[in-house]
């Protein structure tokens, strides 16, 4: 049985004067733009009680009311894919995602994804938008993700993400030696030419990352990055933008760099590192049902630890 969606929101000043479909996407981000547009056309999403078109301009102060039935995501297969679950109750589950697992079906990845696994593990999650997925990790990024098991939990988690009260802290190994930490406040949007890539662009969405140095090596740095926003590829784009791309990043990696007179093992490991060296290490949020602040930590994966050990050996051999 499908759940009923009942949401209401007032258009804030900063969104006034935009198209209805654009405003709806900002106020109800847990639903896809195409789904929202369909509800607008069907009269399920009204403005001050009136049915408008998606392209109609709406001013600040207007009341948006959404009353619709959440359709089950029956087009996706439930698949028995092993998940490393670090926490689960009737409202949420937290997983430790391995490298290579795509989060959501897309072109080229119609099955074998986290969404397919969730539909098998929690069948009722089919009634939750996007099978409860409220934030994503790239295919080859490892670490912690929270998933909502109910519509109420989904709504509250999305609200926390919008309010930037969910703490997401990552660790990365980057190319280059960073002298000190800092903040990157640079908007992110689609690359002007390579549409599959993201880039720092003036017309992009606000994106803020805070980074600090954990350990320096001869030509690399182990960093910790805290997200204030959660844009697509944010850490990868931001670190590359300031000149410190992630080791192993096939898209934003930039120039390959090897410390002078490095061991063959280190050289080979750096050349063949199979993914971007990025791990979602810490996750902290308010439980959507109890309000209790909860925190989880994921240990660094083996490939990450192996590279760190080789970089330490290289530094010590050089200093010695």
UniProtKB/Swiss-Prot annotation:
EC number(s) reported in the record = 5.4.99.23
The chemistry this enzyme catalyses reads: uridine(1911/1915/1917) in 23S rRNA = pseudouridine(1911/1915/1917) in 23S rRNA
Any one cellular component term from GO for this entry? cytoplasm
Residues annotated as the enzyme's active site: 138
- Span of domain S4 RNA-binding: 18-90
Q: Which UniProt keywords apply?
A: Cytoplasm, Isomerase, RNA-binding, rRNA processing
Membership in a protein family: Belongs to the pseudouridine synthase RluA family.
Name-wise, this protein is Ribosomal large subunit pseudouridine synthase D
Supply the source organism for this entry: Pseudomonas aeruginosa (strain ATCC 15692 / DSM 22644 / CIP 104116 / JCM 14847 / LMG 12228 / 1C / PRS 101 / PAO1)
Q: What is the lineage of its organism?
A: Bacteria, Pseudomonadati, Pseudomonadota, Gammaproteobacteria, Pseudomonadales
């Amino acid at each position: 049985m499908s759940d009923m969606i009942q949401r209401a929101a007032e258009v804030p000043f900063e969104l006034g004067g935009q198209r209805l479909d654009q405003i709806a996407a900002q106020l109800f981000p847990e639903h896809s733009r195409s789904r929202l547009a369909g509800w607008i056309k069907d009269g399920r999403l009204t403005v001050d009680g009136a049915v408008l078109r998606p392209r109609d301009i709406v001013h600040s102060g207007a009341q948006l009311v959404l009353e619709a039935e959440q359709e089950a995501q029956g087009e996706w297969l439930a698949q028995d894919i092993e998940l490393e679950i670090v926490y689960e109750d009737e409202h949420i589950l937290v997983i430790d995602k391995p490298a290579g697992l795509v989060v959501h079906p897309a072109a080229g990845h119609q099955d074998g994804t986290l969404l397919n696994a969730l539909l098998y593990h929690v069948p009722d999650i089919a009634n939750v938008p996007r099978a409860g997925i409220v934030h994503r990790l790239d295919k080859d990024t490892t670490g912690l993700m929270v998933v909502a098991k109910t519509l109420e939990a989904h709504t509250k988690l999305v609200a926390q993400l919008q309010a930037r009260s969910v703490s997401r802290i990552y660790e990365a190994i980057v190319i280059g030696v960073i002298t000190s930490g800092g903040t990157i406040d640079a908007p992110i949007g689609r690359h002007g030419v390579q549409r599959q890539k993201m880039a720092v662009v003036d017309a992009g969405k606000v994106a803020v990352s805070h980074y600090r140095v954990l350990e320096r090596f001869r030509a690399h740095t182990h960093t910790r990055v805290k997200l204030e926003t959660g844009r697509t590829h944010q850490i990868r784009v931001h670190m590359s933008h300031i000149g410190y791309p992630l080791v192993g990043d096939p898209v934003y990696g930039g120039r390959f760099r090897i410390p002078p007179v490095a061991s063959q093992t280190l050289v080979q490991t750096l050349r063949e590192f199979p993914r971007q060296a990025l791990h979602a290490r810490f996750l902290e949020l308010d439980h959507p049902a109890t309000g209790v602040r909860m925190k989880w930590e994921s240990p660094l994966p083996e490939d990450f630890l192996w590279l760190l050990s080789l970089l330490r050996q290289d530094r010590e051999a050089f200093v010695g």
